Amino acid sequence: RVEDVVTPGHLERALAESWGGSRGHALVFLPGAGEIRRAAETLEGFARANGARVLPLHGRLPLEQQQAALAPSSDRKVLLATNVAETSLTIDGVDLVIDSGLARVLEHDPRTGIDRLQTVRISQHSAEQRAGRAGRLGAGHVVRLWSQREHASLAAAELPELDRYARTGV
């Protein structure tokens, strides 16, 4: 399963290796709320030991929690986000992005006639968008949790949602 490729342990190791070279907030891209919850549990000890807070950021959170994640803070933050943070938000102070390379997309299964959220690899375009979140207002750094060979094999861009449905006959 594609979602088993990146574990909370991978994230913790990547964060630990990159944290010292960063002064701002870290933005970690994960595919969904479940992965965010598991990563938050794993990273809480690291964050506490480094004077930071772990904050989730996804569309199913109550507005107050989303606002807390986005609010300016003198404390360093580890923001665990879905692709909602890829293009629609500017988060001040982020200078480190850790990218799982995964996203959840709605896909139609023509065999069953059911729409399901699937965890998929992102495109090269999405990877660049995510990398651009680091250092929007200064120098930044991105850690991709996949190899250059895997990056070269990614689609150039996502198929638009309407096209995904059109290809399945919906």
Regions found by a protein language model. Give the residues of each.
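P-loop NTPase motor module signature
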Residues: 1-170
